[in-house]
Amino acid sequence: FAIDKFDQTTFNLLTMLDSLDKFQTIADGNIIVKLHPGEMAVMREYVGPLAQQALEIFSKKYEFTPKGPILIEMFPKHDDFAVRTVGLPGMIGALGACFGRVVTLDSPKARPPGDFNWAPTLWHELGHVMTLQLSKQRVPRWLTEGISVYEEKLGSPAWGREGELTFAMAYGQGEHMSLRELNAAFQDPEKISLAYYEAS
């Protein structure tokens, strides 16, 4: 705040970091998980083991061990996740994000019951850990998203995104995307769901 006491992003980040200081931490090998104290008792049993499983599978498949530690932060308030990720509240539609060695995501409390499943979101973001590190952060978005969605489907049959009908209709109407158009489609709210499916 030394330069601008009214900078909204700085204010948001400092406020969020104050709440993040109260989170509890679990360290398991190359993985560090930060959880809200109110969720620790339940989520500690699931988050670390699922992350370990995903990274073991990916490391074997891609013949690459990601540099760690890998930090996973789960937020019970979506706006805290958004501020931690981009500095501002909102981020409508986003459930998780990855920066190579840092994964942020909504916890189950951040959404209405039954609205989303945190496990495929974590699996998806850990897929990004692999692609971002393997490419030294130089992978096109369509490719990293495509690999993560593909890996979600392999992680559990229940996790696959439903997109066959939407894709078939777009394809039948000549509205599917070419490889050249795919990256830009991730910036278009009307095309992003189809872009995730096509990329996978």
Where would I find each of the regions flagged by the language model?
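Alpha-helical protein-protein interaction scaffolds
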Residues: 1-16
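Short domain-boundary/entry signatures in modular proteins, especially
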Residues: 14-24
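Juxtacatalytic substrate-recognition/specificity segment
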Residues: 23-141, 151-160, 167-196
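Peptidyl-prolyl cis-trans isomerase
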Residues: 144
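Acidic, S/T/G-rich, low-cysteine, solvent-exposed domains in lumenal/extracellular/periplasmic regions
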Residues: 199-200
